[in-house]
Amino acid sequence: MQLHFAHVNGGVRIFGGNGFFSTVEDNVINGGATIDGYSGFWLGFIRNTIHGSTNFSNNTLGDPDANEFVTNTIRGNLFCHNNVPAPHVGDSGGSPNNVSGRKVDQCAAPGL
């Protein structure tokens, strides 16, 4: 899945799937975002503005540097649960997520 430089109304929901890599970068998403059960090699969720809560759960990636989840502005809560590896900055050079609500579970880690 590649989603770049888009304006999305109604939210983004990705359930399952796999592939070499997936990126959701530089988007404006109205309605929240969910990525649940993805099992590819690498996943990046970077520099998005999300109007609504975001759920990032049950994703298992092959690369130890996968699950880069940084530099997002989230107007809602950020839930991260049961991801392998846990969401992190990685080598993206990104900054912590700006979340107006709560950062829960794995996304409550310092630097995210």
Q: Which functions belong to the PLM regions below?
A:
Residues 4-5, 9, 15, 25-26, ...:
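Feature marks extracellular polysaccharide-active and adherence modules
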Residues 62-112:
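Leucine-rich solenoid repeat scaffolds
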Residues 19, 60-62:
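Short, solvent-exposed linear patches
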Residues 4, 21-22, 92:
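A subset of signal/propeptide-processing and intrinsically disordered low-complexity segments
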